Amino acid sequence: MPRNRRLTSSLSRPIVLFLVLLPALFVILRGWNGFAYPSTVAPYSDLTLSHFTFIDYIRQQLLENYTFPLWFPTILSGTPLIANPLAGLWYPFGWPAFVLPLPFAFNLLVGLHLSWGALGMYLLLRQQRLGIAASLFGGLAFGLMPKLFAHYGAG
């Protein structure tokens, strides 16, 4: 058996799972006490100014009125909330943010999205018949890509 084959065959599913979940762990641990990237250096991002505000308002309306709000009255003279893609009403994977504590919910969702992308890249590379080690490297390269973290920092 070639040396490379032994190396890749020794990687088990738990190791693959850990490496694919590494981006999520990175974001969650980095932002354990607050936002992972919109920090005091860059406090004015879309995440802190719009997403956080929308989620907080939706959560308040769910607790007080037991319904999803269709209108957001605090910006200008009010804006439609149901048609605003930043509010996330129609994105099921963002719904945990309505019940989880903020900003932990944002860190968790961003981390899981990065891990989902890393898993997708890993599976794509495996489908292209690359080895396990090369596929893991590609998945991690995607999941830990600085450009994606820059997007998170910008909101």
What are the roles of these predicted feature ranges?
Residues M1-W32:
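Start-transfer (signal-anchor) and selected internal transmembrane alpha helices
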Residues R6-P14, T40-Y44, R126-A133:
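Membrane-interfacial loop-to-helix junctions in multi-pass inner-membrane proteins
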Residues L17-F18, L108, S135-L140:
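Hydrophobic alpha-helical transmembrane segments
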Residues P23-L119, L140-G155:
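Membrane-interface coil-to-helix junctions
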Residues Y122-L144:
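Transmembrane-helix signature of polytopic, membrane-embedded enzymes
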